[in-house]
Amino acid sequence: MIKLENLTKQFVQKKGQPLKAVDNVNLNVPEGEMCVLLGPSGCGKTTTLKMINRLIAPSSGNILINGENTNDMDAVTLRRNIGYVIQQIGLFPNMTIEENITVVPRMLGWDKARCKQRAEELMDMVALDARKFLHRYPKEMSGGQQQRIGVIRALAADPPVLLMDEPFGAVDPINREVIQNQFLDMQRKLKKTVMLVSHDIDEALKLGDRIAVFRQGRIVQCASPDELLAKPANEFVGSFVGQDRTLKRLLLVSAGDVTDQQPTITARPSTPLSEAFGIMDDHDIRAITVIDNDGKPLGFVKRREARNASGICADITHPFRITGKAEDNLRIVLSRLYESNTSWMPIVDEDGRYNGEISQDYIADYLSSGRTRRALNIHENS
């Protein structure tokens, strides 16, 4: 865990005037989570990051890593236990890729075989052929490949904490997305505590478990990506995340988040049509989903067809043209609804059981209601 307590950094300008680059910042990043420090240039993000591994000394306040105050730690030992990734990559041009990756492990006394094995493991994580690249030098690799090496080098000694200062900023958009996706896959497996600096709202929304928005050295809001978009704290945050923030939420909210807010109303194949009609009439719905004994959707019965009809639901059940998964984001769901020219569809869990229904109206209601997918226990500045 990373904990910042009243962290402040004050510089003296050329004319002798004091300037608070970081002003009384309080922030908790739980173990295994990624927090993105987001804001415009000069707002204190990078200064905050550099104080964590003591590249810059704080003017006041405390930094705790897993409960230990960094002021009480040897600076060299501290840095060897923190992975650090910068935009400029910083690979050593006179070292091979293997030597670059294993700089810190070799400092820690790892033997050659262990270093090589670790380098091969990390190369595999970013889809680079170890046999092809480990003996090469940085100049023999593309910019995107070098950036991958910069990321895995920071992970070589398996540090619990990773600091990243705009790590993907110098890469072209196509490579950036690939590297971001690879890094997310690694993070899901490794569960490092990560603090990442960015000025890109889309990158922050994609990568962060939580986002701390900086302005003039202070945190003005710290929230989950979905909450940040749904409930910006003030006009500055709202303008920074963009006027299309509701559309951005489509990528963050899952179908299951929406169906969890809706009543689950179903019938069985053997349910009398008169009973099914009564249920639909009571809840003012135009159709009811029919499920089997395992809870899997078989189709639906229309209210107008069940009115005054005899028999059971199985007699007039219409099969579904499409179904969605609970983990699908709303962008995928909307796309499938539009492609199929239908207004609603059933959502199923990983075992294929009925989870509820989702419609264009439900999605609009959810996004406009201000509800968020989860609440985080976040300590932010007042």
From Swiss-Prot:
A GO biological-process term: glycine betaine transport
PROSITE patterns: ABC_TRANSPORTER_1, ABC_TRANSPORTER_2, CBS
Span of domain ABC transporter: 2-241
A single GO cellular-component term on record: plasma membrane
Binding site for ATP: 39-46
Keyword Membrane carried by entry: yes
Keywords for this protein: ATP-binding, CBS domain, Cell inner membrane, Cell membrane, Membrane, Nucleotide-binding, Repeat, Translocase, Transport
Role of this protein: Part of the OsmU ABC transporter complex, which is involved in the uptake of osmoprotectants such as choline-O-sulfate and glycine betaine. Probably responsible for energy coupling to the transport system.
The protein's assembly and partners: The complex is composed of two ATP-binding proteins (OsmV), two transmembrane proteins (OsmW and OsmY) and a solute-binding protein (OsmX).
Name of protein: Osmoprotectant import ATP-binding protein OsmV
Organism name: Salmonella typhimurium (strain LT2 / SGSC1412 / ATCC 700720)
Gene from which the chain derives: osmV
